[in-house]
Amino acid sequence: MTAPSLSLRHAAPYSTVNSLGFPKPPAQTRVVVAMSGGVDSSVVAAMLAAQGYDVIGVTLQLYDHGAALAKKGACCAGQDIHDARRVAERIGFPHYVLDYENKFRESVIEEFADAYLAGATPVPCIRCNERVKFRDLLQTARELDADCMATGHYIRRLMGPKGAELHMAADPARDQSYFLFSTTQEQLDFLRFPLGGLASKAETRALAAQYGLAVADKPDSQDICFVPNGDYASVIEKLRPGAADPGEIVDMDGNVLGSHRGVIHYTIGQRRGLGIGGLGDPLYVVRLEPDTRRVVVGPKQALATKIVPVTEVNWLGDEPFEDEIAVTARIRSTRPPRPAILRVTGKHRAEIELLDPEEGVSPGQACVFYATEGSRVLGGGWISHRRGG
């Protein structure tokens, strides 16, 4: 893969800063745009090209075979690659497709399967951003002599007194900060998120129509590209044949209430589909025990969690990661941040004390930290287990 000519990139000093924060004209600023084939990243590419930037589009082929190929809304499947290429051709900038299937499988899919078998509920989209898009693709952007890489994520990169900061999107309904907590400071310095300040997705689609993009009305992509029809269990059984052993459904005292087909079919907080109806008060999955192949159920109040231990903490705050600090914390992508205390318990380890207990805290999910005032993302980590309160 050869980068386009650099002849415009070494000219006389520029007297102002362009919209991406560089002290040179847009024509001398090379931007690699990570294009999924959806409307968001397509608008980013078209917008930057319209502003005169030296745009290069790159699409990753992550998972493009079997059932996923036929799945509508699968990120970076065959149709999406075609759509990204059409946008590049219409606007007039180079576009490359990189085969990342092996890297994606090794870095994301294998861990996804192992996590479910261990009784966790993983978030593969975060791992994909962390291990593929913001690591390998970002390195490719550097090799193309890019000044920065832009994506279609709804999150903001704002300059603070000590450098670039990560902030929630202007549109709370579209905010993707939960999925980007593991972005490092070095990566943040190189990344740009042009859509983070838009008030709504309607604005994005209006821009797509304005630029004449065929994807203007394309439906939003699904979160997990390699899980056809949301059937996690069938994917895991294909990856790990025979690993999903049946077992017992028990109450919190160990009394057997029924049987199950494998812990991979259950998540913390699940109520429906347990097959143990007619027992009086509703029962919820409160714990998964893969070693004993038990699914433990209990009343709703047993889901209340106050202390949330987290590992692999990525810290983006200005002050050193030590002692304790008041934050707000989000324990699921669909939950708003809640007041909490963050306590450091070791290198890259911490615990969150929620001021009000939350239900549905699940190992394998992310816990993201925010400043108590404003919209700044301070970092986050992975929930290792749960403790009641």
Swiss-Prot record:
Residues that bind ATP, according to the entry? A34, M35, S36, G37, G38, V39, D40, S41, L60, G152
Q: What is its main location?
A: cytoplasm
Q: Where in the cell is it found?
A: Cytoplasm
EC supergroup of this enzyme? transferase
**What ranges does the record give for the region Interaction with tRNA, renumbered to this chain?**
174-176
Q: What is the disulfide pattern of this chain?
A: C128-C225
Question: Which residues are listed under the site Interaction with tRNA?
Answer: H153, Q365
Give coiled-coil spans as residue ranges: none
Q: Which domain of life is it from?
A: Bacteria
InterPro entries referenced in this protein's UniProt entry, alphabetically: MnmA-like, MnmA-like_C, MnmA-like_central, MnmA-like_central_sf, Rossmann-like_a/b/a_fold
Give the signal peptide range: none
**What this chain does, per the record?**
Catalyzes the 2-thiolation of uridine at the wobble position (U34) of tRNA, leading to the formation of s(2)U34.
Protein name, please? Answer: tRNA-specific 2-thiouridylase MnmA
Q: Which organism is it from?
A: Paracoccus denitrificans (strain Pd 1222)
Q: What is the lineage of its organism?
A: Bacteria, Pseudomonadati, Pseudomonadota, Alphaproteobacteria, Rhodobacterales
